[in-house]
Swiss-Prot record:
Transmembrane segments: none annotated. Catalyzes the reversible oxidation of malate to oxaloacetate. NAD(+) binds at G11, A12, A13, G14, Q15, I16, G17. This is Malate dehydrogenase. It catalyses: (S)-malate + NAD(+) = oxaloacetate + NADH + H(+). Belongs to the LDH/MDH superfamily. MDH type 2 family. Keywords: NAD, Oxidoreductase, Tricarboxylic acid cycle. GO terms for biological process: tricarboxylic acid cycle. Its EC number is 1.1.1.37.
Length: 19
């Protein structure tokens, strides 16, 4: 599932990693 914490971490760090 998608957890709020996880989403926040993967959302910020994820976009930086992909970008």
């Amino acid at each position: 599932x998608k957890k709020p914490v996880x989403v926040a971490v993967t959302g910020a760090a994820g976009q930086i990693g992909y970008a």
